[in-house]
Every structure is written in C-alpha cells, then in structure tokens.
Amino acid sequence: RGLGDVYKRQFGSYWFETGTPTYLVNLLKKHHYDLERMAHEETDEQVLNSIDSESSNPIPVIYQSGYLTIKGYDERFGIYRLGFPNREVEEGFVRFLLPYYANVNKVESPFEIQKFVREVESGDYNSFFRRLQSFFADTGYDVIREQELHYENVLFIVFKLVGFYTKVEYHTSEGRIDLVLQTD
C-alpha cells in the first residue's frame, strides 16, 4: 500500500483492488449465475480442477482466482463447501458487481449505497423504493428472458451492501419466499 494510505489510516480492500475481476463478472452474467449461491457453493474436486471456457459453471474460475476458498469438506461424499475467504474479499467483490448488474456507474455506486442506508435508517421507504426502481430502469432486452434471476441478483447485491442478511428464494414448508432480509 502507499504511504498515503498509512497517513490517512485507511487501507480499504487491498487484496480485492489488486486483481480487477471484470472477466469473472462477465462469466457470471454470461451463465446467469445466482449470486446468492456463491457464499455457500458446494462442489466436488473434479469441478474445482476444471477450467473450460465453454463450461457453464463459473465456480472453478472464481475459485482458482482466489475469490472463493474451501470452507469445509464432506469426506463421505467428496464434496467441498466454498465461500469467500473473508469479509473484505466478499464486500469488495459484491461492490464491484453493482455497476454491472444495476443502472449505476462505478463512480456513483458507493454514494448510492450510502443513500440506501440513510433512507432505511430514517424510515424513508418511498425514497428507498424509488431509488431501487431506478436500478432496474435500464434493464436491457437481453436480460428479459432471465429477468427474475437478474432482479434477484440486483436485490441481493444492494441489500448485501446495505448490510442486511440476505437470502434469496428461501424455502419453507408452505412455499417459497422470494427474498428474506434481516437487519439484526
């Protein structure tokens, strides 16, 4: 890190900033990957060791790039449980995704998240939902066929960055809840 960071006593997401994952984001979008799954993906050794540009599974590339790590292993079935190595990597990755999934540019992205947080904290839900709708305003025609997953991914990114526990497509004995948010 530079001396400016030491002087300001701010270190940011150094690990994340050193490797821009644009290729990975494009891979996730190309294969319509459900982002919520990434934090608890399960797979086997064969998948982890396979990198094929034609594969519809982006997980091996993301794992081998270091954005996911092994969190557990089930010896009986040979299944690995993956997740982000730490909060810094997860937050950096999710922040990087926002401009690629929502109608917001990279410069405005951090300010939009601050506005979301302030609106929730102040109880200004009308402004919150107007801002959220603007994130979907320019959804391209190519996204329409995978529209539900696109919306789930945008909501997951926004609410994750706001600091909510987010669970997409939560299954209960009575059916499915599209999105669960928990503030505490």
Model-assigned labels for residue ranges:
Residues 65-73:
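A short, conserved structural fragment
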Residues 83-114:
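Short, amphipathic alpha-helical interaction segments positioned at domain boundaries
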Residues 2-7:
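Short, small-residue-biased leader/transition segments that mark boundaries at the very start
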Residues 8-61:
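Conserved helicase/translocase motor-coupling segment
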Residues 158-183:
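Active-site metal-binding core of divalent-cation-utilizing nuclease and nuclease-like domains
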